[in-house]
Amino acid sequence: MAVQQNRKTRSRRGMRRSHDALTAAQLSVDSTSGETHRRHHVTADGYYRGKKVI
């Protein structure tokens, strides 16, 4: 197994973790029903990009 030779500094640890942050879900408002939904997802009543898909 690989074992590190030298201790990683707080700065290096922080640089590694800089890409780990989560982003909030992007929300959109449907043009037909005015309902809020996640981007690129079907609304709860079955509309996607203004068309009934479900």
From Swiss-Prot:
Keyword annotations from UniProtKB, A to Z: Ribonucleoprotein, Ribosomal protein
GO-annotated biological processes: translation
SUPFAM superfamilies: Zn-binding ribosomal proteins (SSF57829)
Record bears the keyword Nucleus: no
InterPro entries, per database record: Ribosomal_bL32, Ribosomal_bL32_bact, Ribosomal_zn-bd
Positions with biased composition (Basic residues): 7-16
GO CC annotation terms, alphabetical: large ribosomal subunit
Region (Disordered): 1-54
Keyword Ribosomal protein belongs to the record: yes
Taxonomy, superkingdom: Bacteria
Single GO term (MF): structural constituent of ribosome
UniProt biased composition (Polar residues): 25-34
HAMAP family in UniProt: Ribosomal_bL32
Recorded family membership: Belongs to the bacterial ribosomal protein bL32 family.
Protein name per Swiss-Prot or TrEMBL: Large ribosomal subunit protein bL32
Species of the source: Tolumonas auensis (strain DSM 9187 / NBRC 110442 / TA 4)
Lineage of origin: Bacteria, Pseudomonadati, Pseudomonadota, Gammaproteobacteria, Aeromonadales
